[in-house]
């Protein structure tokens, strides 16, 4: 029985001393059984190193094996000794099973609990409580210890002690149950080491030798095992990163010193050995340096001195090429730089992939980019980041299944369920093929989004019907749509067949056991295990062993969770929400098994994980100020203050894990261990930005090192530039070389420069490569690509649009905004999929229809809206609105309580606007003549004629539309007609937009009205019609400000909010009668006109609202020219990608749904159609000049 320590800082070759000790023991004692104990994290690597060393001591044997030297972790040591004992045959229980035990205990002791009462419903509380109970057990703390703690605390009269006493009261109740319900029935992870401690007390270890390496501290359970080993084993050697032995408590350094943690461990072990009267051997200090380079040796010395706040006595090294700092613009650039350096060092220097170790404080930040990038660079890696099972489709299926039941077939839950691809309908030939299933599901989702099918719609008797509304096939169903209907209903019927019976059975389940059986039967009957087996087999066919193993791991865990649920909660009533939470927590804490696929690969891990320090090169990446040092928080139920109070009541062999403060104090030491992992080179790297991360800064640790050693900062370029002279770092693999070649070639073309010599050489070599020749030529040819659409041939344009273009004026507006977008929408008829929602178009249609019906009903009754009172108006409005929500296009307004509320708001807006017409009528002589006037619509009665233009070459254009309202005024036998256009948002007439074809609607409607006056009115012979103008009416239920009401009557404030805006003819007779209420000089609150002090009427200053007859005619003429110009360009196949860019930087691309298709990029030759900055006067001057020029011709 003896204890020996191997001590030294991290630069020394500790392992060599330990391995030599093995051979010494073997020489001294041929019967020696040697156990090499390392952290579980390092077991595989350590075992390889031990075997390699032992083999090297043999005489040229190709094969080597040994049974007397074993490498274990503490838990694996327990398996080795106890695998055949009764203890080890007891059923294992997962953490999820422990959650279930604690859940039951919380329910059963609800009346006894104080601060934990009702907490089981809080997300994460049960898992947090289980973690705390496990920590108590790992700390060797018993129920009786907790009771003693409570007694001690009750004698302290402080708020902290009182709160902790209450907390321990509840913990004690649950902890007692926790231990009793698992004792002898289950083997918990926290039971393994105590069982080993007990077992070893009766085991003959007189020929056993133990080496313990890789630890800086031990849990109380591990310490208990060591205590037994000290008393029963022949010899125990413990290796610590420590520069001196500490035998007296007074000799312990300050908690902030670098080696404090190791000092404390040494002291505890030393005292433990003395107490047990175990012989303590002289400390052994390795003399051989493991760290080979001066830079790293100096770094170790500096880090010790600076952390211990000692004078810095470190000589600066020359070029420091073995110690470097790299700055990258993004995390992706950072990983690419590392992959490139590794690839080149392996290719050009004497390195293997196994010589590299990559560490980062937070590997989660890189989890989505590491594997793809290293795969691109063909660098084999093992990412030591356990992947959680919570994201597996089986877990998604279970979650969605219970959500579908709880929330009654909601769209989100149904798609989540079906998209797991674990529930597949069966046909007479077997399961539906996955390709067919995906197509059917896509069509089903489209239909659901279009018509809002959810809830009971899934269970209805009648099939869903797929159809599309169109101008030519309204209400009909084509053969294609009939086929889609059948595909969609395959899935709907399948859901209707399997889910309602399952849900009914769950509702009838008497207890948890029955519910678990029902769930398991449902999954098996519907082929979920079969689908998982199919996934495994496909992965095996593709040679992906990692993915092949996962379906079985997940299913096995699910079965284990179900067994544990039945055992622990099966006799209780079944609560679906609690059951699902327990399952999800189980999967959340579960991870997939990971085994390195090859020995020669780069290991990627976190700086906090203990590493074998046998690598030549280490990259510490992601070294930012946010994570190095780490910002540690205590997430356990016992706070740091609680821990300090508790620890004072415990014996030396019982102790909790470190406080957050203690772990923060150990950060320099943990990072020191990471710094010292390599033998030769250490690289630090950090990004300045990441996904949703800006302003990242270098770690203060790295900053200290950089300043101490005057290290230069290497900036990693994500992409090469023409100016880069050193191109080697951009050609790590042929694929990356090609990718970077394309980037440089594109730059060369853009700058009109020749391709640099080195890149021409790379281009030549890639062309000579049989694998990359074709791809290289194809991609290089793409450099000449410009994203310029080709003009369509006239014959193709005619096939798309016909020889006669029957269209609305709004489509021409879209054409002038972007010719290519028009082609995509109306030529190729591309559209976004329909979604069941209340769009602005829907609300606009509701307003238009309601106002149209209101005015038509009044006209039918020969009543003027001006002459009725409020009660009569309300009666008419009720008649008009009644039943509108039953129309197919407005059925969404009945789909939910929210939509019914919106329906009331829509009705209120219609009421406001209708009454505004009444109030306006009190002040103006303008009266509604017709509403919803159609022109150019084939097959409609009483419609007006289309605006028709012959374009030549057999082409013609017919413009159709619908005028919201035509108003009329008759003054002294002079008739004026005007247009009113309803808008859901505020609109003003923009002369520039009208000139460039971006606002054609109002002028086109005015033209259509003027050309159809004979169909609108019974005119007397020679009677002339004057255009009153064209105005917008903003349909709104305005919010009135209090200050406005205080200054003016409420009715006037409302009128101002509903004031017309647009163009009005400069005619004094007309203007003076548009608002007869203006007595003094001032603005009208009905129309955009003003009465001036001299009595004449005109427009509001600089508004352009009032227009002369001649200028109006010029606008109408320009409008007709634009329509013909657009139609000619369309027939000529013009599909230019020329989105308009207004002077205020708005563009036609801003809200376009076709941006992904257009791929607009000014670097690829695309250009905006930039409008000049012009005002109303500029446009009118242009029109006059153009008209004058035409007159002269």
From Swiss-Prot:
One of its GO terms (biological process) is double-strand break repair via homologous recombination. It is an enzyme of class 3 (hydrolase). Belongs to the helicase family. AddB/RexB type 2 subfamily. The heterodimer acts as both an ATP-dependent DNA helicase and an ATP-dependent, dual-direction single-stranded exonuclease. Recognizes the chi site generating a DNA molecule suitable for the initiation of homologous recombination. This subunit has 5' -> 3' nuclease activity but not helicase activity. The gene is rexB. Its cofactor is Mg(2+). Keywords: ATP-binding, DNA damage, DNA repair, DNA-binding, Exonuclease, Helicase, Hydrolase, Nuclease, Nucleotide-binding. Despite having helicase-like domains, this subunit does not have helicase activity. This is ATP-dependent helicase/deoxyribonuclease subunit B. GO terms for molecular function: 5'-3' exonuclease activity; ATP binding; double-stranded DNA binding; helicase activity; hydrolase activity, acting on acid anhydrides. Its EC number is 3.1.-.-. SUPFAM superfamilies: P-loop containing nucleoside triphosphate hydrolases. Heterodimer of AddA and RexB. It comes from the Bacteria. InterPro entries: ADDB_N, DNA_helicase_suRexB, P-loop_NTPase, PDDEXK_AddAB-type.
